[in-house]
Amino acid sequence: MAAGGSDPRAGDVEEDASQLIFPKEFETAETLLNSEVHMLLEHRKQQNESAEDEQELSEVFMKTLNYTARFSRFKNRETIASVRSLLLQKKLHKFELACLANLCPETAEESKALIPSLEGRFEDEELQQILDDIQTKRSFQY
């Protein structure tokens, strides 16, 4: 750093998702599942298509829509609401909730590898039961 300069982050805590340490702005933000984002974007696309003065959707919009279509784990509102409700009952941080629902890991070990903040907070059996419940909900969607 140049002499006389100051680091604008000085005094700020270093963010670390593995420790659930996020920037201040994230404290009031809510997380969305990829499936929820997909439904919102699809709705916006349909609105645009049915409008009298249909506008071309941006490249970023279309890329995001395609991404969320590819990585959406849940295909309908009922399943999304059910999975979100299930995960809200657990003592999960909103970041962990979104990660579990978006990634849908199959084992507790895989979950802890992908989401390190789960380590030490959940027993493998408890975490496996959550994952099994999510998988059951996925298997019953249309």
UniProtKB/Swiss-Prot annotation:
GO cellular component: cytosol; nuclear speck; nucleoplasm; nucleus; RNA polymerase II, core complex
SUPFAM superfamilies given in the database record: HRDC-like (SSF47819)
Family label: Belongs to the eukaryotic RPB4 RNA polymerase subunit family.
UniProt-listed GO biological process terms: transcription by RNA polymerase II; transcription initiation at RNA polymerase II promoter
InterPro entries: HRDC-like_sf, RNA_pol_Rpb4/RPC9_core, Rpb4-like, Rpb4/RPC9, Rpb4/RPC9_sf
UniProt KW keywords: DNA-directed RNA polymerase, Nucleus, Transcription
Complexes and interactors: Component of the RNA polymerase II (Pol II) core complex consisting of 12 subunits: a ten-subunit catalytic core composed of POLR2A/RPB1, POLR2B/RPB2, POLR2C/RPB3, POLR2I/RPB9, POLR2J/RPB11, POLR2E/RPABC1, POLR2F/RPABC2, POLR2H/RPABC3, POLR2K/RPABC4 and POLR2L/RPABC5 and a mobile stalk composed of two subunits POLR2D/RPB4 and POLR2G/RPB7, protruding from the core and functioning primarily in transcription initiation. Part of Pol II(G) complex, in which Pol II core associates with an additional subunit POLR2M; unlike conventional Pol II, Pol II(G) functions as a transcriptional repressor.
Species assigned in the record: Homo sapiens (Human)
Name of the featured protein: DNA-directed RNA polymerase II subunit RPB4
Subcellular locations according to the entry: Nucleus
GO terms of molecular function: nucleotide binding; translation initiation factor binding
